[in-house]
C-alpha cells in the first residue's frame, strides 16, 4: 500500500514540486526591409547635394607631411601635386636654416579653392631628417609632433565649452621619400616607417624616379614592397582597414602594383607636341610629369586627392586618433584636465 502513496498526491502538491515555466525574454524585432516602389518622389537623393553645399560653404582641412633626406625634391613634388607654391624649397631657406642640427617641424598653411570648394591645406616639412652623421632616433620629433596634434584635438573634444568646429591640425597623410638607390631601403627608412606607421598614414614614394631605367624602377619597387612586408610594416591603405570586397580589390591592386609610387616633380613647363606640359629637361629629352609612360606622379595625385583623400581623413580620425585617445584616457584614468576658456571656446573655425 505504501508504494501507492506518491501516486495519491494532490494536484496542489504536484504544482509545488514542478516550477512554473520562465517567461521567454523579449527579443527585439529586427527592422523588416521591404523593397517597395515609392508612390512618388521623396527627395532622399538630395542629401548628397546638401553635403556638397555645406562642404563648399565651410571648406575642409587637409594636412600633409613630407619626410625624407634633403635633395629628394620633396617641396617640388608637393608644389606639383597642388599646382601652387604651397611648400618652400630648400633654396628659399636662409643660409643658417639650410642644415638644421636636429629635425625641425615647419608647418605652412594655405587656402586653395577649386570649383567653389575650399581646402585648408597645411604642408608640414621636416628639414634635417636623415641629414646628420648620426641619425639615430631622428624620427622621434616627428612622432612627437603627430601625437601633439592628437592631444590638441582631444583637449578640445572634452572641453565643456568646446568650439563649434574643432580646428583639425592632425596629420592625415605622410609622404615618405625613398632615395632612388635601386638597391634596398636604408635602416633609417625601415626604422621610421616601422614606428610611424602605427600613428599616421604613410605613403612611400620613390623620389626622382627619372634617374632609373624602367627595369631598375620595376625591380626596386618590388624590392621595397618585399622589405616592407618582411619587416611587418603597413603602409596606407592598410589591409586591415578594407571595408568590403570592392575596397579590398581596389586597394590590393594599389598595394601590389603601384606602391611605392615612383615619381618626378617639376614646376616648369615645356612645349611638347604643341602643348605646354610640366616636365624636367634632361639630355635625353623632356620627362613629362603627368605622363604615365614617364613616371607615376599622376597615379599618386589621383590616389591622394581624387580617390582617397576622404578616406585618409577618416582613417586618421577613426583609427589613429581613436587609438591615441583610448590609450590616453586609459593611462590617465579618465578625461584629461579640462580647460575652460569661454571667450575663446566659442570662436568658430569656418
UniProtKB/Swiss-Prot annotation:
Residues 58-331 form the Septin-type G domain. Septins polymerize into heterooligomeric protein complexes that form filaments, and can associate with cellular membranes, actin filaments and microtubules. GTPase activity is required for filament formation. Residues 1-10 have a biased composition (Basic and acidic residues). Residues 125-128 are annotated as: G3 motif. Residues 207-210 are annotated as: G4 motif. It comes from Mus musculus (Mouse). Phosphorylated by PKG on serine residues. Phosphorylated by PKG on Ser-91. Gene3D superfamilies: P-loop containing nucleotide triphosphate hydrolases. Residues 68-75 are annotated as: G1 motif. The modification Phosphoserine is found at residue 91. GTP binds at residues 68-75, 102, 208-216, 265, 280. The lineage of its organism: Eukaryota, Metazoa, Chordata, Craniata, Vertebrata. This is Neuronal-specific septin-3. The keyword Cytoplasm applies. Pfam families: Septin. Expressed in the brain including the cerebrum, hippocampus and cerebellum (at protein level). Filament-forming cytoskeletal GTPase. May play a role in cytokinesis (Potential). One of its GO terms (molecular function) is GTP binding. One of its GO terms (biological process) is protein catabolic process at presynapse. Keywords: Cell cycle, Cell division, Cytoplasm, Cytoskeleton, GTP-binding, Nucleotide-binding, Phosphoprotein, Synapse. It comes from the Eukaryota. It is found in: Cytoplasm; Cytoplasm, Cytoskeleton; Synapse. Belongs to the TRAFAC class TrmE-Era-EngA-EngB-Septin-like GTPase superfamily. Septin GTPase family. One of its GO terms (cellular component) is septin complex. Its main location: cytoplasm. Residues 1-29, 328-350 are annotated as: Disordered.
Amino acid at each position: 500500500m505504501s508504494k501507492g502513496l506518491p501516486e495519491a498526491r494532490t494536484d496542489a502538491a504536484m504544482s509545488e514540486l514542478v516550477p512554473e515555466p520562465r517567461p521567454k525574454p523579449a527579443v527585439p524585432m529586427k527592422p523588416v526591409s521591404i523593397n517597395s516602389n515609392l508612390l512618388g518622389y521623396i527627395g532622399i537623393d538630395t542629401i548628397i547635394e546638401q553635403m556638397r553645399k555645406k562642404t563648399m560653404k565651410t571648406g575642409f582641412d587637409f594636412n600633409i607631411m613630407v619626410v625624407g633626406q634633403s635633395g629628394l625634391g620633396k617641396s617640388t613634388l608637393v608644389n606639383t601635386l597642388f599646382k601652387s607654391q604651397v611648400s618652400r624649397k630648400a633654396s628659399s631657406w636662409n643660409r643658417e636654416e639650410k642644415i638644421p642640427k636636429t629635425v625641425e617641424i615647419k608647418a605652412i598653411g594655405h587656402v586653395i579653392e577649386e570649383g567653389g570648394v575650399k581646402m585648408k591645406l597645411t604642408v608640414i616639412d621636416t628639414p634635417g631628417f636623415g641629414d646628420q652623421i648620426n641619425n639615430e632616433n631622428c624620427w622621434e620629433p616627428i612622432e612627437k609632433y603627430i601625437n601633439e596634434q592628437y592631444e590638441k584635438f582631444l583637449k578640445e573634444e572634452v572641453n565643456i565649452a568646446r568650439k563649434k568646429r574643432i580646428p583639425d591640425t592632425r596629420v592625415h597623410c605622410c609622404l615618405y621619400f625613398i632615395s632612388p638607390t635601386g638597391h634596398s631601403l636604408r635602416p633609417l627608412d625601415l626604422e621610421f616607417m616601422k614606428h610611424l606607421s602605427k600613428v599616421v598614414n604613410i605613403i612611400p614614394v620613390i623620389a626622382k624616379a627619372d634617374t632609373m631605367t624602367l627595369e631598375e624602377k620595376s625591380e626596386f619597387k618590388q624590392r621595397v614592397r618585399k622589405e616592407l612586408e618582411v619587416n611587418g610594416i603597413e603602409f596606407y591603405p592598410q589591409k586591415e582597414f578594407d571595408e568590403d570586397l570592392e575596397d579590398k580589390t581596389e586597394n590590393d591592386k594599389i598595394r601590389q602594383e603601384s606602391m611605392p609610387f615612383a615619381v618626378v616633380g617639376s614646376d616648369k613647363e615645356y612645349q611638347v607636341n604643341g602643348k605646354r606640359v610640366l616636365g624636367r629637361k634632361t639630355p635625353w629629352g623632356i620627362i613629362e610629369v603627368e605622363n604615365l609612360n614617364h613616371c607615376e606622379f599622376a597615379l599618386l595625385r589621383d590616389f591622394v586627392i581624387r580617390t582617397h583623400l576622404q578616406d585618409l581623413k577618416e582613417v586618421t580620425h577613426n583609427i589613429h586618433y581613436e587609438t591615441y585617445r583610448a590609450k590616453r584616457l586609459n593611462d590617465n584614468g579618465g578625461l584629461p584636465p579640462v580647460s575652460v576658456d569661454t571667450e575663446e571656446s566659442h570662436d568658430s573655425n569656418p
